[in-house]
Amino acid sequence: MRTLTLLSAFLLVALQAWAEPLQARADEMPAQKQPPADDQDVVIYFSGDDSSSLQVPGSTKGLICHCRVLYCLFGEHLGGTSFIHGERYPICCY
């Protein structure tokens, strides 16, 4: 019984020691800066030729595109480029 109590106490101390650095790192992270309300311009460029399906009404039915941070997900294709606050991001469609 003493062994179980000792092991439980050791486990709790180990968990507490492991959790403290995580909390310290979370406290050190700066809050994400929010853009001003009047700075919401988004420029989007689509790749492709002039006869692309983006100009034909109804042909884009069911096409869903997202501006991604780094790269397109599995099953998506690169549909263009977006610029948000001067940063370039891929537009991925499926």
UniProtKB/Swiss-Prot annotation:
InterPro entries recorded: Alpha-defensin, Alpha-defensin_C, Alpha-defensin_N
SUPFAM superfamilies documented for this protein: Defensin-like
Compartment(s): Secreted
Superkingdom assignment: Eukaryota
Disulfide bonds listed in the record: 65-93, 72-92
SMART domains linked to this entry: Defensin_propep
Biological process per Gene Ontology, one example term: innate immune response in mucosa
Main location: secreted
Keywords for the protein's UniProt record, in alphabetical order: Antibiotic, Antimicrobial, Defensin, Disulfide bond, Fungicide, Secreted, Signal
Signal peptide: 1-19
Presence of the UniProt keyword Transmembrane helix in the record: no
GO cellular component, one term: extracellular space
Pfam families from the UniProt entry: Defensin_1 (PF00323), Defensin_propep (PF00879)
Family: Belongs to the alpha-defensin family.
Biological role stated in the UniProt entry: Has antimicrobial activity.
Miscellaneous comment as given in the Swiss-Prot or TrEMBL entry: The human orthologous protein seems not to exist, its coding region does not have a start codon.
Name of the protein in its database record: Defensin-7
Organism of derivation: Pan troglodytes (Chimpanzee)
Lineage: Eukaryota, Metazoa, Chordata, Craniata, Vertebrata
Gene: DEFA7
